[in-house]
Amino acid sequence: MPPKKQAQAGGSKKAEQKKKEKIIEDKTFGLKNKKGAKQQKFIKAVTHQVKFGQQNPRQVAQSEAEKKLKKDDKKKELQELNELFKPVVAAQKISKGADPKSVVCAFFKQGQCTKGDKCKFSHDLTLERKCEKRSVYIDARDEELEKDTMDNWDEKKLEEVVNKKHGEAEKKKPKTQIVCRHFLEAIENNKYGWFWVCPGGGDNCMYRHALPPGFVLKKDKKKEEKEDEISLEDLIERERSALGPNVTKITLESFLAWKKRKRQEKIDKLEQDMERRKADFKAGKALVISGREVFEFRPELVNDDDEEADDTRYIQGTGGDEVDDSMGVNDIDISLYVPRDVEETGITVASVERFSTYAPDKDENKLSEASGGLAENGERSDLDEDSGGGGQENGSIDAVPVDENLFTGEDLDELEEELNTLDLEE
């Protein structure tokens, strides 16, 4: 279904009106009770600007006059229509000796009586119902009791109803001073009345159905509290008027000085409280104290706690199935890979030609390698080491005496077999 446009428009007008009133209150805050001409002129200008914007006051007055004229024209039209189409009312007649005030005016019923209080007939529309014959099946007191609700009662009326309703039953009950909670709840919630029945047993309820002396309803308490309360604007105006004319004017410098003074007073107060609590703690008077204050008052407890700590070390036991992993693990440090300049003093560098002078892998060189290596590969024999490296002079190598009968054919065969067996085992 489409939304109701009229309802929305009406709601928006009310909301706009409330917003305008709120803006006016904010802009004229504290100026309501001022009687000066300038203040009143300012309030009037602000109100006009918020309500009518930038319109000229003459235009506003003219529009209001036009609205009044339209209303008057509508009233005249309604009066003319009523005169043209009004129903014809016959002259009202009553019997001899009857009181005219006991008869309702027929013209008043149609809304056409122009005599007002001078009319000899009654203008009370409830008079007809009062003059009706009573029905034997209806008790008028029931209607009166139904209309007589607790909303219209005062304390005296409430006590009277309670005494009439529960007076005799209270006399028969055992003596107790406890008031029934259902009774109190019904009174507080405005549910009590002539036809109220106690949920705790009706008239057989063992508790009292009477108000204790000096009892005050909650709604009456709230009214008294509301009467004592005053609005924030009135409180500010009252306090301002109580200050008098000889006061210091608030400026930025005075406000900052006041704020600094208040802050220093707060710090001094905290220090005094801390000193007092510290003295109470030393004297054993402070029963409730925080952990932070304990360490502030006695900082040596921090070191004592470290000394009393348990230094027991626990070693993890290794089972029979576990493998002892002795491999060390080092973290990667990026700084190790940064290139740096290294001093070359005391460092020997191999020659580039060492690969070209390397002896070929032939049977001729195996014997020399086994006996100590060739000098061409940069290796030194045991004799060179013993002689201090003096065997090589001017690129020539001294001949080493070799005993040809040292290794016979049988010895070489045994050596080859041992070498073959070693290769297989590896």
From Swiss-Prot:
Pfam family, one: zf-CCCH
Self-association state and partner proteins as the record states: Interacts with DRG1; the interaction forms a polysomal DRG1-DFRP1/ZC3H15 complex which provides protein stability to DRG1 possibly by blocking poly-ubiquitination. Associates with microtubules.
Positions with biased composition (Basic and acidic residues): 13-29, 64-74
Induction, per UniProt: By erythropoietin.
Region of interest called Disordered, as start-end residue ranges on this chain: 1-30, 53-74, 303-328, 358-426
Compositionally biased spans, kind Low complexity: 1-12
Stretches the record annotates as Required for interaction with DRG1: 236-260
Zinc finger (C3H1-type): 99-126, 174-212
Segments of skewed composition (Polar residues): 53-62
InterPro entries: ZC3H15/TMA46_C (IPR032378), Znf_CCCH (IPR000571), Znf_CCCH_sf (IPR036855)
Coiled-coil features, chain-numbered ranges: 61-86, 218-285
Role summary: Protects DRG1 from proteolytic degradation. Stimulates DRG1 GTPase activity likely by increasing the affinity for the potassium ions.
Gene of this entry: Zc3h15
Annotated keywords: Coiled coil, Cytoplasm, Metal-binding, Nucleus, Phosphoprotein, Repeat, Zinc, Zinc-finger
GO cellular component: cytosol; nucleus
Highest taxon listed in the record's lineage: Eukaryota
The family this protein is said to belong to: Belongs to the ZC3H15/TMA46 family.
Protein name: Zinc finger CCCH domain-containing protein 15
GO molecular function terms attached to this record: zinc ion binding
An annotated GO BP: cytokine-mediated signaling pathway
Subcellular location: Cytoplasm; Nucleus
Keyword flag Phosphoprotein: yes
Residues with the Phosphoserine modification: 231, 351, 381
Stretches with biased composition (Acidic residues): 410-426
